[in-house]
Amino acid sequence: LLIEDYGFDVDNAAIYYLFDRDPDSNTDSAFIEEMLGKLGSARDVNPDMMRQGMLLLSYPCIESFIGMNLLDDSLAYCWNKGVQNGHQLKQALNQDGALANKITQETLIKSVEALITALNTVGVNTQADELLNSLDRFADNNRKVYDWQEEQRRQKGGYGLLSLMAIALLDLGLIQSAEDE
């Protein structure tokens, strides 16, 4: 529709693939690992895919982004609550009153701060210049997150609450580092 009716040029658009890493519904680890390597840039075309795109995983589901906006120590939330899949997370967030309609400009900044904390924990270099420069080649950082989360699941029985959706906000310049201003 966008392409045909409005002449939208997807070849010059940033494309993000939001993907739940719910262990109950997305069980094909080999496919996910393959996509981590192929979908590493929102703007640069991957020859294997014939289209650009950045894979942004959420652990265990996209509602993790709500948690990162509204919860303190969001990374530990799933472990502390015994949450192991997306359905359980949705229920827990609802019970705790962490609802999407409570997201504000201030909580979006909190979600980026939670993301930076989580990426530091994983071992991703989050110095402003390094992180922002890595957004055009995010596959390596994505892989670090994936490997770390899989190890946490083996050790603790579940993933840490984490959504990479804020990466898109940083990549698009909708949220900027204070160092950039």
Label for each model-derived stretch:
Residues 1-10:
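Short, surface-exposed loop/strand segments
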Residues 9-21:
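Glycine-rich, often proline-containing surface loops adjacent to acidic residues and nearby aromatics
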Residues 9, 55, 159-162:
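Compositionally biased, intrinsically disordered low-complexity regions
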Residues 1, 28-31, 161:
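Phosphate/oxyanion-binding active-site loops and adjacent basic polyanion-contact surfaces
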Residues 6, 16-17, 59, 77, ...:
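Sequence-level detector for tyrosine residue identity
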Residues 99-181:
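Extended, basic/helix-rich recognition subdomains
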Residues 9, 24-26, 151, 175:
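A generic signature of intrinsically disordered, low-complexity regions enriched in glycine/proline
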Residues 18-127, 169:
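Activity-critical C-terminal alpha-helical subdomain
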